[in-house]
């Protein structure tokens, strides 16, 4: 059963084993810190590439966004949704959660002490939206983030149906999904997948696996969970 948290542009679906978690208050504080910083730092908000800074006394969300941005060669705001998911999950884990799934606009952070199925929203006419990752139980967090040149409101310069990245940190998965999706260009879907895979090679240390879908071509790199055909999901992107 999902709990919904809606705060301005943050729309979260939450499944957790914690009854009284106060997560909404925690996310509200994250958003306040972010909004306060953005008002004074327009480059942080608008840049499409990493931003140099020399400040030391930064709030945790700003630090993590700067770090993920520099790892992934994208602007800090390309990592914001994944970062909020990641920090929300860390907060729940600090409260002793062993099973929590946070989905923030398609960017997921999960810890699951039992099997879970995460739907892949590709908007692909052949696959439909009936495939998902079967995630084995694990005690450490996982980020699963998707970027698309065809759906969603994020900026993408590529044309893949979807690029899904799995990484230990959702902030990094979010930034990498954007970066790799931007490289999904070419004269046909085969070229798009090939170019995106080539771009992924530069970031192998940062992810567990990448899945790229473009029309009738699919490519993957790294280690992905088992992909299953189903309509029964614990969470959808």
Curated annotation (Swiss-Prot):
Q: What family does this belong to?
A: Belongs to the UPF0280 family.
- The name this protein carries in UniProt is UPF0280 protein ORFE
Q: Which organism is this protein's natural source?
A: Methanobrevibacter smithii
């Amino acid at each position: 059963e999902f709990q919904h948290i809606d705060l301005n542009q943050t729309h979260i679906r939450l499944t957790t084993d914690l009854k009284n978690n106060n997560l909404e208050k925690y996310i509200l504080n994250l958003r306040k810190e972010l909004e306060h910083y953005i008002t004074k730092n327009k480059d942080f908000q608008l840049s499409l590439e990493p931003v140099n800074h020399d400040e030391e006394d930064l709030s945790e969300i700003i630090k993590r966004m700067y770090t993920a941005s520099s790892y992934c060669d994208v602007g800090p705001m390309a990592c914001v949704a994944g970062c909020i998911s990641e920090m929300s999950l860390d907060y729940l884990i600090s409260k002793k959660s062993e099973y929590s799934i946070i989905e923030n606009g398609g960017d997921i952070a999960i810890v699951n002490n039992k099997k879970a199925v995460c739907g892949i929203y590709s908007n692909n006419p052949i696959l439909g939206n009936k495939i998902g990752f079967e995630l084995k139980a694990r005690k450490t967090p996982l980020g699963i983030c998707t970027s698309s040149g065809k759906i969603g409101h994020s900026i993408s310069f590529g044309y893949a149906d979807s690029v899904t990245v799995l990484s230990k940190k959702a902030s990094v998965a979010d930034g990498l999904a954007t970066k790799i999706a931007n490289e999904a260009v070419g004269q046909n879907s085969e070229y798009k997948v090939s170019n995106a895979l080539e771009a992924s090679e530069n970031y192998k240390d940062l992810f567990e696996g990448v899945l790229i879908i473009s029309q009738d071509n699919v490519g993957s790199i790294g280690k992905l969970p088992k992909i299953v055909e189903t309509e029964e999901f614990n969470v959808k992107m």
